UniProtKB/Swiss-Prot annotation:
The keyword Glycoprotein does not apply. It is found in: Cell inner membrane. It is an enzyme of class 2 (transferase). UDP-N-acetyl-alpha-D-glucosamine binds at T10, G11, G12, N124, R165, S195, I250, Q295. It is a peripheral membrane protein. It comes from Thermodesulfovibrio yellowstonii (strain ATCC 51303 / DSM 11347 / YP87). The gene is murG. This is UDP-N-acetylglucosamine--N-acetylmuramyl-(pentapeptide) pyrophosphoryl-undecaprenol N-acetylglucosamine transferase. Cell wall formation. Catalyzes the transfer of a GlcNAc subunit on undecaprenyl-pyrophosphoryl-MurNAc-pentapeptide (lipid intermediate I) to form undecaprenyl-pyrophosphoryl-MurNAc-(pentapeptide)GlcNAc (lipid intermediate II).
Length: 366
């Protein structure tokens, strides 16, 4: 099987694509997979480390640009269509997946024009511009939330969930305890702000420590700060003698998840998919500038099921965050109910479901 996975730009688009590739290789070890993205997208840094082949196209973003920038974007679209056609002619894929982001658009369109089966993945409640357009021509659409079906043709839309890395389900607690200096018997709080950290979350958590002093001997914290905030966040924990492992970046996220009892995080599609696949209680703080406000929508979906607590970014401060933490940790039944609701919401085998759809399309083509 020869497969192109197109799109990326951000982790929310890219990581489900990598997870899908992992599922494909698991079922078809001989599969040949190439990713197509842009030199400025996250894929340029991440894909080379995975061992997959990566090709670039010249497409530029369109949404939120000035008139002159939109003119440049349209010009880049024409060039990227030519580049996409060349990639497809050279590689001759059996199927093309679009994982979202503007880089997916010309590749999926070029595949459609060549009558190659295409599947687009929509990880959020409201599709972005690329997927709204591609949904009209794609062979199939894989969605994460039932509400999203209103944006696509029901006949070819499937509720699959967002693919996650299988490693997420296989965390090694014993390894994690050594890695993060975990003390048995304490409640572990994992704090994430995305791969670059999030200053607003860092500030709220450190300001909230004074409100969490009564819990100091019951909790321990793993905090990913981002490079810029590492030193001062580390010092805040040390000054108040909280048991905390503070890191600029967590490379062993699988192990961090395995020992976490409560996760404080943004609400990107990949993060939500991972948290629910492993049934973690969480406090979600949606990134307020995400396209179409999709992070808040993701978080509200979980909130409606009792799977998380929600704090809007504009309302976030130390006292508010500490109140949410106290509410959950002082009533063990609340955390247990959140864990069960989270697990019920999760779809850990989304990748396999999407592969089944691909197999069906390929059988029909024959």
């Amino acid at each position: 099987m020869r497969v192109i996975i197109a799109g990326g730009g951000t982790g929310g688009h890219l990581f489900p694509g990598i997870a899908l590739a992992e599922s494909l290789i698991g079922k078809y070890p001989e599969a040949q997979i190439i990713f197509v993205g842009t030199p400025k997208g996250l894929e340029a840094k991440v894909i080379p480390k995975t061992g997959y082949e990566l090709s670039f196209i010249s497409i530029q973003g369109f949404v939120g640009k000035s008139f002159s920038e939109k003119a440049k974007s349209l010009k880049s679209l024409l060039k990227s269509m030519f580049e996409s056609k060349n990639i497809i002619n050279s590689f001759a894929p059996d199927i093309v997946f679009g994982v979202g982001g503007y880089a997916s658009f010309p590749v999926v369109l070029a595949a459609f024009l060549k009558k190659i089966p295409t599947i687009i993945l929509e990880q959020n409640t409201v599709p972005g511009l690329a997927n709204k357009l591609l949904g009209k021509i794609a062979s199939a659409v894989a969605i994460t939330y039932p509400e999203t079906i209103e944006y696509f043709s029901r006949e070819k839309t499937y509720l699959t969930g967002t693919p996650i890395r299988k490693k997420i389900l296989e965390g090694n607690k014993e390894k994690a305890k050594k890695l993060f200096d975990i003390e048995e018997g304490r409640i572990t709080i994992l704090i994430l702000g995305g791969s670059l950290g999030a200053r607003k979350i860092n500030k709220a958590m450190t300001e909230g420590l004074s409100y969490l002093l009564p819990l100091k001997n019951r909790i321990q914290i793993i905090h990913q700060t981002g490079e810029a905030d590492y030193n001062w966040v580390y010092n805040e924990y040390r000054n108040l003698s909280f048991r905390a492992t503070v890191l600029p970046f967590i490379y062993d996220m699988v192990e961090a998840y395995s020992v976490a009892d409560l996760v404080i995080s943004r609400a990107g599609a990949s993060t939500v998919a991972e948290l629910t696949a492993i049934g973690k209680a969480s406090i979600l703080i949606p990134y307020p500038y995400a396209a179409y406000n999709h992070q808040e929508m993701n978080a509200r979906r979980l909130l409606s099921r009792g799977a998380c607590e929600l704090i809007l970014d504009r309302e976030l401060n130390g006292e508010v965050l500490a109140k949410k933490i106290n509410k959950i940790l002082n009533k063990p039944e609340i955390m247990k109910e959140m864990e069960m609701a989270s697990l019920a919401f999760g779809k850990p085998y989304a990748g396999e479901k999407i592969i089944e759809i691909a197999e069906s399309l390929l059988r029909r083509k024959r």
